[in-house]
């Protein structure tokens, strides 16, 4: 039994998160004949994640982008900056305080974690983690930001 990403032949351009729910008969597989057949049963989470999605790198304080999915995505944002920073996505606000932090802060909306160098940086963040709705989205920031890299995790039902 295991879990991970699974891609099906009828939807080769992405994947589901799934886990195997039945026993795989490895002892039968390993006995001589290399051509064995057996069933593998998966329990999949409901979202189809779009494959081959490029990260969005934003270097200007105002930008827009489109979520091609049919449901909101839970992005991972890597913000490089200094001082006090405000991020805005469609009017929703996250404040970041880089005091004592050099480099980047990573905000993972799926895990609801805010990290700096793999260490908890929750105290540096104020606001709710972003969800990117389907369609056109407006993004902006104020403060001293070098870049925002968004791993969008586009998905559909």
Predicted regions mapped to residue ranges:
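Short beta-strand and beta-hairpin "edge-sheet" elements
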Residues: 2-46
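Intrinsically disordered, low-complexity segments enriched in serine, threonine, and glycine
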Residues: 48-157
